[in-house]
Amino acid sequence: MKNFFLSLKTTVWTLFTLVCLFFVGSYMMPAHKEVFSAMNDQILFHWVDNTASGNLGQTWWFFAALAALVLLTINTLVCSLQAIKGRWSREDFLLRISPQVIHAGFLFILLGHLLGAGWGFKLSGMMPEGAFAPLPESMALRLQEIRVKTDERGYTLDWAAEASIYEDNALVKTGILGPNKPLFYKGVGIYLKSLDFERGPAALLVIAKDPGAVWAFVGGVLFILGSMTLLALKWNVRV
C-alpha cells in the first residue's frame, strides 16, 4: 500500500483521471444549470448537502473528482514525508527542498478551499437604499446611500454605494462600495454588483466570508516560489 502512494504512476493516473472528470463537468454544468447554478450562491458544502447529494445522476463526476483529490493529497503527503526522511546535504539542499515547497503550496491551497467550502458563508440579493439586513456572526448591514454620477446627457459615469457594518448592534465600520471596490471587516467582504432603479434605488450585493483565503494565498505563493526555484536550478544544471 505504501508503494502505491509513493508511485509516480499513482500521481500521473490520478491527474489524468481528474482531467477527464473535469472534462465531463465542463459538459454537465452548462447542461444542468438547475443543479449547478446554486454553486455560485452558497458555499460548497451547503450546495453538496442541499443539491448535489440529491442529484447524483448529474453530480457523480464531482464526487469522483473529490475522491481523486483526496487520493492526490495522500500521495503528496506520503511522497513529501519520504523525501524529508532521506539524507540531506548543503550541495543539493535547494534542489531537494524545492519540490517539497511546491507540495506544501498545493496542500495549503487545498486546505484554503476546504475551509472556505465548509466554514464560510455567501449571501446575495437586492437591498433597497436605507434598508437594514442581519448577517451571520451577530453582524448586520445597512445600505446608507446609493450614488450615481452622470454626464450632461444622462449617461452613467460612475456609481457607488455607502454601507455600514454593525456588530452586536454597534456601528463598527462605514465605507464606500463600488465596482471592484469591496468593503471588508473581519474577513467578511461586501461586494456591489449592480444597481436597480425600476422599483426605487436598490443594489445587488454579495456578502461572503472565506476563512481559507489566506491559506490559499500562502499556498499560491509557496507553489510559485518552489516552481521558480526548481526551474532555475534545473536550468543551471543543464547549462
What is the predicted function of each stretch?
Residues M1-V239:
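Solvent-exposed, non-transmembrane regions of integral membrane proteins
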